[in-house]
Amino acid sequence: MKCPKCNSTHSRVVDSRHADEANAIRRRRECENCGTRFTTFEHIEMSPLIVVKKDGTREQFLREKILNGLVRSCEKRPVGYQQLEDITNKVEWRLRDEGQAEVSSREIGKHVMNLLMHVDQVSYVRFASVYKEFKDVDQLLESMQGILQEKNKRSDN
């Protein structure tokens, strides 16, 4: 690593710690030339994931888009931000575990809805109303009946 002060490439690691929920390593370094201390981060490099949208266009996967959609769906609901981060992480890892270079936006939405249903049903309906593009109240009611049936199945077991 180059020293930010003198550009020397000779430094020693003074301290190492996990960062970003163990997805990165934070290293405290000291330049052997000038003594300046600086911090570096080491992250896992992920292969790019491409999202194929409904209209056929392609764009790079951005986890922030999932998180922003979840935040909007969960406004004024008893859902913590960490829960939304967890859902986003699970969705991203599931997509990456599938090993595909491209994934449809529809597939992403299904993963999000499956996880969100078990966290908060009102937020699920809000998310589904945008994702499924309900045309009328009947479609919304159908979705809600599906939630009730799922809930009844779980309570029977």
From Swiss-Prot:
Entry protein name: Transcriptional repressor NrdR
Domain ATP-cone residue range list: 49-139
Cofactor note: Binds 1 zinc ion.
Entry's family note: Belongs to the NrdR family.
Organism: Staphylococcus carnosus (strain TM300)
Recorded name of the encoding gene: nrdR
Function: Negatively regulates transcription of bacterial ribonucleotide reductase nrd genes and operons by binding to NrdR-boxes.
A molecular function (GO) term: DNA binding
Source domain of life: Bacteria
Pfam families the record matches: ATP-cone, Zn_ribbon_NrdR
Keyword Nucleotide-binding listed: yes
Keyword vocabulary terms for this entry: ATP-binding, DNA-binding, Metal-binding, Nucleotide-binding, Repressor, Transcription, Transcription regulation, Zinc, Zinc-finger
